[in-house]
Each structure stands twice: as structure tokens, then as C-alpha cells.
Amino acid sequence: YRDEPWPEQARRYAAMVSMVDRQVGEVLDLLKDLGLEENTLVFFSGDNGGADYFSNKEHPRGIHGANVNPQTGVEYRGKKGNLYEGGLRIPMIARWPGRIAPGQVSDLLWYFPDVLPTVTELAGVTMPDDIDGLSIVPELLGESAAGRPQPTHDYLYWELGGQTAIR
């Protein structure tokens, strides 16, 4: 991206995204080459919402745009590093050939503590009752549409820099 007529930060961002894409592709290719693809659940997600740190006159909301929901076009308040929706709402991609239907889209509200109960259920391990997360296996495998209800959180809680958010 060195030759692109973009601001320096935009070229760096594009390079980082391209590098992540290549590296994830290498991991997925290796799983396939080792014959582990259909026996491996891969999660991919971020740890926070988008950033608008690289704003300038041309891109006042940041070089990679505002935190806009790609399906609704609604802009979320906040960004990386705060407790508004734009700082907390992140996508997650799950891939498991033969088990998770490609192209599946869900609006299930989940968070990282849900990963542990999910993988332990898939491994056949019983979780203690005092674990914060919920298994999202029914949603991942399409079982919620087939009659196995997907449990949901009564509330979610975040803390950052002396602030709290409850949803």
C-alpha cells in the first residue's frame, strides 16, 4: 500500500488488515493440510469496537470510518476504549466445516466468557455452575432454529477506568 495516495495511517491500517488476512489464511490452510479442519472450531474476533484515532479534515471520523452497523447503517455511539455500544459491540466469526453452516448470520448477544462453556460442552466436559459464560452451541450449530433453545444472558457487565456498563 506504499504507493496508494492515502494518508500514512490508512496505508498502515490496510497493511495490518492484509497481514492478518494472510496469517489467518495460513492457519486455516495448515488445519486443512493436517486433516484437522473438520475437527477444529476456529473463533475470530476483536477485543473492542472500532477506533477513530486517525481523524483528519478528509476523514473526521477516522480513516476506517465510524462504528456503523453493516446491516442497518446505524452508527454506534463510542469507540475503542470506552463503554458505549461502539466500544463494546464487536463481530465474531466462527468456522467449523461440516458443523457450522457457511454464511450463517446471528444477532445473538455473546461475550468472551461464553467461549469456555461453548468449547467445554463440545468436548463433553461438565462446567461448574458458577461460570459466568453460557454455551452458544445451539446458535453455532443451528440447533436453536431446530428446537433447542439458546440460553441468553440476563445482563452483561463491563468495567473500564472507573466506569461501568450493564446491559
Where are the regions a protein language model picked out?
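Active-site His/acidic residue clusters
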Residues: 1-11, 51-60
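Metal-dependent active-site segment of extracytoplasmic phospho-/sulfohydrolases and closely related
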Residues: 19-58
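Soluble non-cytosolic domains of exported or imported proteins
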Residues: 7, 11-18, 106-110, 130
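Generic enzyme active-site microenvironment
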Residues: 45-46, 93, 112
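C-terminal cap/loop subdomain of S1 sulfatases and analogous C-terminal strand-loop tails that border
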Residues: 52-83, 99-104, 108, 113-167
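Ligand-binding/active-site lining segments
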Residues: 86
